[in-house]
């Protein structure tokens, strides 16, 4: 088992990574002992892992209950958030309760936001079950729900007390979901770690085969990078914004196509290629860098082009609502090479239109 610490002074917490962690009562004991616990999961994950996790938690917790939500980005809304609050209130959960997110990024975001809001803040644990949530969304305290006019527009920064990543979950993860998670892995290589990027190029087959050593290595490295960035810039005033590479374009794709039709990682993959194309257009990188990025994304069966139905106007209406917009200026995360990126506002509408039109 690997352990990584997210260093945030009195709000620091550990990330545990390895196989067979769902049975490890000692991992959960410091957070749940003697507490009432509500496990939040979805209709896909609950039949696979809810009983196992509930049994482990019950060994130390005073009581364990659960609420099961529908599975999908389209259910990441205030209406379904209220189902968590209903379960907490109807069950008379007090301020010393613990919420547990058992699922992917949607469940993690919603559970974390519920924990941030319920009685002005209760403890929660992240148990991410998808590759995307294991390498990205479960770490760092971003919590939110979507609004019809924009993704993650209603949320809070609120850190978990513990993250437990059991890699055995990946054995039940559909191939499309695994690929979507690899988009976020590739992102880390582009923005911060050229050695990771090269390692990914050399280990595509091992990762697709779920080789245990390869999987643990890549999850741990991504969590290390995320922990470093979050420790330096928790509320995204500076370097943390780089973690949004591909996300401004990607969120526009998700919103325009309807949440759930394109997976988040698929949209981010296409968005990273668009960001790299923008860097080429602005003279920030050579086209060979764009080709490496696109080739690695394609190697994991991810899209490298935006939907044909989307033109400049359908992108820009969503991009203008991006959380990185400052003073009315659109700001994009753009690669400066493999292992480096910057937040830039230098791309004009004409240049973006050229990038979006490009086949």
UniProtKB/Swiss-Prot annotation:
Short name of one Pfam family: DHQS_C
Molecular function via GO: 3-dehydroquinate synthase activity; metal ion binding; nucleotide binding
Family named by the database record: Belongs to the sugar phosphate cyclases superfamily. Dehydroquinate synthase family.
Annotated metabolic or biological route of this protein: Metabolic intermediate biosynthesis; chorismate biosynthesis; chorismate from D-erythrose 4-phosphate and phosphoenolpyruvate: step 2/7
Function, as annotated: Catalyzes the conversion of 3-deoxy-D-arabino-heptulosonate 7-phosphate (DAHP) to dehydroquinate (DHQ).
EC number: 4.2.3.4
Co-factor note (free text): Binds 1 divalent metal cation per subunit. Can use either Co(2+) or Zn(2+).
Keyword hit for Nucleus: no
Protein residues bound to Zn(2+): 184, 247, 264
Cofactor(s), names only, from the UniProt record: Co(2+); Zn(2+); NAD(+)
Species this chain originates from: Shewanella amazonensis (strain ATCC BAA-1098 / SB2B)
Subcellular localization: Cytoplasm
Source organism, top-level taxon: Bacteria
GO biological process, one term: chorismate biosynthetic process
Protein name, UniProt field: 3-dehydroquinate synthase
């Amino acid at each position: 088992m690997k352990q990584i610490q997210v260093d945030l002074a009195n709000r620091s917490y550990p990330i545990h990574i390895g196989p067979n962690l769902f049975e490890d009562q000692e991992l959960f004991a410091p957070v749940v002992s003697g507490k009432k616990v509500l496990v939040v999961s979805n209709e896909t994950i609950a039949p696979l892992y809810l009983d196992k996790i509930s049994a482990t938690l019950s060994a130390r917790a005073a009581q364990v209950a659960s609420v099961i939500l529908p599975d999908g980005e389209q259910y990441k809304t205030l209406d379904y958030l209220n189902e968590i609050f209903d379960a907490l209130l109807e069950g008379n959960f007090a301020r010393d309760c613990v919420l547990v997110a058992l699922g992917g990024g949607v469940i993690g975001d919603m559970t974390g936001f519920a924990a941030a809001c319920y009685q002005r803040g209760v403890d929660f644990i992240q148990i991410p079950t998808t590759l995307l949530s294991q390498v990205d969304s479960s770490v760092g305290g971003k919590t939110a729900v979507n609004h019809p006019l924009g993704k993650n527009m209603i949320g809070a920064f609120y850190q978990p007390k513990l993250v437990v990543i059991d890699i055995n979950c990946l054995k039940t993860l559909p191939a499309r979901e695994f690929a979507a998670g690899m988009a976020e892995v590739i992102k880390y290589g582009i923005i911060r770690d050229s050695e990771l990027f090269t390692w990914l190029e050399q280990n595509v087959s091992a990762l697709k085969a779920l080789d245990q050593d390869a999987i643990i290595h890549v999850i741990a490295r991504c969590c290390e990078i995320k922990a470093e960035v979050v420790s330096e810039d928790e509320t995204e005033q500076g370097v943390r914004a780089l973690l949004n590479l591909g996300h401004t374009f990607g969120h526009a794709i998700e919103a325009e196509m309807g949440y759930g039709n394109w997976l988040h990682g698929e949209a981010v993959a296409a968005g990273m290629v668009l960001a790299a194309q923008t860097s080429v257009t602005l003279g920030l990188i050579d086209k060979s860098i764009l080709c490496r990025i696109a080739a690695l994304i394609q190697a994991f069966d991810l899209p490298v082009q935006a939907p044909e139905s989307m033109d400049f106007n359908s992108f820009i209406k969503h991009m203008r609502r991006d959380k990185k917009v400052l003073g009315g200026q659109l700001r994009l995360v753009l690669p400066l090479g493999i292992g480096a990126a910057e937040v830039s506002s230098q791309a004009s509408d004409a240049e973006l239109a050229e990038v979006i039109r490009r086949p």
